[in-house]
């Protein structure tokens, strides 16, 4: 076994099912996020924090309702909590659907607008496309799947890093760096 294979097997970027679009996108997005953070671009996390907060509110309402409220003794409180749970759930779903969709990372551009990075799989071309929209224009960079993952499902870091760095050199000037 060569030293390169040992390095690959120690990797946390491993896909257990090469036919799983979700898993391929998730592992690749984790790698891309890590590389972009290393380059010190300004990431916007407040929207993720809103998602986390709404999820925690749902957990608290559900837990309180199931542990402390008995329907036979307090039916009005139970109904109020269920309505609150439904309202918060609907808010979270709407927020996810309209704002996040497939977005895995939000960065700030130099002009102050948001840059939402997302990945999509093009099965016909056998590529994973890293893209973002800015001023109604879509900018894309493609990863060849056969070069992105080896036959054992390990991310080929040198190739992936090279594509991410090419993406950042081509589009990084529009992204804002941290102060």
Curated annotation (Swiss-Prot):
It comes from the Eukaryota. InterPro entries: Spc2/SPCS2. The keyword Cytoplasm does not apply. The chain crosses the membrane at residues 49-69, 75-95. Its main location: endoplasmic reticulum. It is a multi-pass membrane protein. GO terms for biological process: protein transport; signal peptide processing. Keywords: Endoplasmic reticulum, Membrane, Transmembrane, Transmembrane helix. GO terms for molecular function: endopeptidase activity. Residues 1-48, 96-179 are cytoplasmic. Disruption phenotype: Causes a severe growth defect in host erythrocytes. Export of protein containing a PEXEL motif, including PIESP2, PTP3 and PTP2 is severely reduced at the ring and trophozoite stages. Similarly, export of RESA is reduced at the schizont stage. GO terms for cellular component: endoplasmic reticulum; signal peptidase complex. Component of the signal peptidase complex (SPC) composed of a catalytic subunit SEC11/SPC21 and three accessory subunits SPC25, SPC3/SPC22, SPC1/SPC12. The complex induces a local thinning of the ER membrane which is used to measure the length of the signal peptide (SP) h-region of protein substrates. This ensures the selectivity of the complex towards h-regions shorter than 18-20 amino acids. Within the complex, interacts with SEC11/SPC21. Component of a complex composed of SPC25 and PMV; the interaction is mediated via the transmembrane domains. Belongs to the SPCS2 family. Component of the signal peptidase complex (SPC) which catalyzes the cleavage of N-terminal signal sequences from nascent proteins as they are translocated into the lumen of the endoplasmic reticulum. Enhances the enzymatic activity of SPC and facilitates the interactions between different components of the translocation site. Also, regulatory component of the CSP25-plasmepsin PMV complex which cleaves the pentameric localization motif RxLxE/Q/D (termed Plasmodium export element (PEXEL)) located downstream of the N-terminal secretory signal sequence of several proteins. This is Signal peptidase complex subunit 2. The gene is SPC25.
